């Protein structure tokens, strides 16, 4: 069979005219038609073969692509690949990469911490041992069905890395989690202090109360010399906070301050007559209760310090000399002696003691008469016997009068004056006496006294 060159109709080889269109078919044309038909048949056969080969080729290409993808994923996502990324970062001091790898949802590690970690690992573990221990641990966990975490440790047994299984990646590879254990640096300042420093890539402020343990946050293993500003009521200091995981205790590590600061130790001279409870020191613009064993500060070594003191003797306040310590003379522990005018203090104390002895004698006479009058008044139930000893309408006057009305007996036997303190027309005294059942009783009273000490009256019982 061949095709008509005019209409394409199939005609027999021995036909001289196309039955469809009437086209005359010569031998030459029939040969051409035959050749064309043969060519068409060959093309059809080729197309059939191509249609069979193309799907196979595509399948082979996809298979090769899958194999390549698998190896790529394995190179970057298998447990061994994950371990290799970490150890290479540590080995090459790539603090930025280490910070990224060790950061977690709850703890962001910054470049500074990461570099401290790298230095610590290389010094306390050794990079070769660190790499070997990680690879051995990963292989062991990879072959095990256990989900129990393993730890990489220093030579002294401190944990520096936790390795644990954390599900799978792409449903094929075990996912390993690499985290650095954290501890809390603890600081205990002598005074309330505010610390400002950077951690986890941002500024942090911690306020620590005096003599109380205060955590600075969470840090990964390292030996830290952390730049930090320290602010107290005495001034602002620039320095460092130092803490070393080699000296840690369980979950905490102690912090040592490293600041250019001075503590002041103050001693008094010529102050033996002053009342201990009244003694105070003034440092710059702040006043403190004084104790000979107390250490004052810290103060910055960059500024002069002005120091003075006060104390009371027999109710009068005396001041010491004022000293200014220049910044150049400030040491870590600076000793200062403040001198009082002992002659002036002693003279005043001697004068007041004479007055007090005179007043004490008068009070002894007053309370002896008061005790006798009170006992007689209660025996006779007559308040008028003792009313002159009280200031009229004072609290003790009203109270004692009520005792008579209620027939409540009050007894005072053998009164003795233990102490006296006078302030103008007001006298406060402590009296010891025996009550009605023989017990010694101490009572404090306040009295009013006139200018020439000739008359005094009870105002209240303290």
UniProtKB/Swiss-Prot annotation:
Sorted UniProt keywords: Antibiotic resistance, Cell membrane, Membrane, Metal-binding, Transmembrane, Transmembrane helix, Zinc, Zinc-finger
Main subcellular localisation: membrane
Entry GO terms, CC: plasma membrane
Zn-finger (C4-type) residues: 4-21
Molecular functions (GO terms): zinc ion binding
Protein location: Cell membrane
Residue intervals annotated with topology Cytoplasmic: 1-52
InterPro entries xrefs: Mem_prot_TcaA, TcaA_2nd, TcaA_4th, Zinc_ribbon_dom
Membrane topology, from the record: Single-pass membrane protein
Stretches assigned to the Extracellular side: 74-462
Entry's transmembrane regions: 53-73
UniProt superkingdom: Bacteria
GO biological process, one term: response to antibiotic
Transmembrane helix as UniProt keyword: yes
Record keyword Transferase present: no
Protein name, UniProt field: Membrane-associated protein TcaA
Organism: Staphylococcus epidermidis (strain ATCC 35984 / DSM 28319 / BCRC 17069 / CCUG 31568 / BM 3577 / RP62A)
